[in-house]
Amino acid sequence: MKVTSLCYMLAATTVAGTAAAQQDPSYIDTSYGWRPVLMEIIEVPVSLKDAMPAGEQMARRHSGLSTAPAVINQTRSRDEDTGKAPCHGWRFLPSTPQKFMPYLDALFVPGNTCVEPCGIICQDMVSTGAQKIKRFLSHYGFQYDLTMSYNYTAIHPRTRHRNDFSSFNHSLTGTWFLAKDCDNSQGVFLTMEADWGQGTNFSERRSSAQSSLGSLCNPQGSLRGGKGVFLPQLALGYSGFDGKWVAMAGTLDVSNYLDQNAYTPGWAGGLMNQSFGSNPALLLPWANLGFLTAWQPCENFYAMYATTSTNTGVNQNPFSDLSANYWMHIAEAGFIMDDVLGMGAGTYRLQYTMIDHGGDMGLGFGLNLQQQVGKNSPLGFFTRVGFMDQDAAAATGTKAAATAGLMLQAPFRKSGWGSRSNYDNVSLGFLWQRAASSEKPMANKDEYGLELSAVVQVTPTFFLQPDVQYIFNPIHATDKDGAFVLQMQGVFKF
């Protein structure tokens, strides 16, 4: 079947909807990416008004969702040379990125907005200053997301090992748009990620709740500690054909692009167990040399492929120890629908992977879906399922896995906390993992977990997140059948 026919067939199953262009610029609240709205002047956080005029806003994107037309139009209305003819040459360090198709836009364009609507504290010096810095750097093509957090974790009942963990963890991801054609059809950019963390009463490299429990899953998805600052991602990219195609090569964190899900946005604002952040059965390497390409021919379909090495250690030269015996290939196809059987928007992803681990080739596949529960509902359902053969499972320690759950996003109140924010939510998740034979000896073959998490936005850039998990039958536990993992973290999102 031709690509155009596929796109038309998928589009026929959706309900088209676009936001009308506005004559006068207004601030946009992306509303978790599902239903962007123009904010009334009284709704705009003072820190946002003081730091950036509405005409310069490029709203924050949400990975796992196609960027809404109203948000993309913010960028296009500011493009240099738009409407001018003839158009010649390239723009270097442009203040706006080149064109990307909507799903790819959410992956590669961070935006220049960090201040969120908030019903508790709407102005503080930290938020205003952070927004000014973000706006200034975007004038030179650099857009980023900076997460800074403090996390406290306790295990109950207590194990024979360490039971409480206090740590600071930080992550910076960004895209530096280096140059683009003046008609915005193509461009060159640099992607990067820097992570660093430090346990205040333990070493993040030697100890964790995971090691104390003997679990296959990692309840502390926030841990970023390595040998100082390390770079999981540093790659040069190119986009062309009006943003329909992207190619990128260098040191890659594959999990930044594949296996996204809007209802499990990761440890800072979503469920904190690492098994909910990405499919635990799939190998999604970071800090490894590789190549990634993405293609979105129409709004309702995309495809991605990545290939990387798998044996590079933290902060090691990515060219060291390169071997065809430690290599990974993964492909993903995504089907994006505005309405599925009247339930609302949904995205369904299929994944296939080949892994060479120590000279043994293994295969696996995964399924990843996100689905609104009711049209325009703040309630959403997510699930990931993955199966690997024994050779592929040796690379992750997981032969099969399934995670599923619900997220209730704001707004779920008329006023105050939970009325408007892109972070306020309550999430519930269930996980199951079956250990690979490479994990022997093991006390249990199957491991289960439950997690309940909530996010309370306090200032335009800071939220609190209490979280409780119960891990049943940890794979390597010999002294108990399960334990609670209690966490509290405070997070700045700049």
Q: What residue spans do the PLM features occupy?
A:
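Residues on the lipid-exposed face of transmembrane beta-strands in outer-membrane beta-barrel proteins
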Residues: 146, 170-178, 234-238, 291-295, ...
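Surface-exposed coil loops of outer-membrane beta-barrel proteins
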Residues: 203-235, 242-332
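Transmembrane beta-barrel strands of outer-membrane/channel proteins
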Residues: 144-152, 190-196, 247-251, 303-309, ...
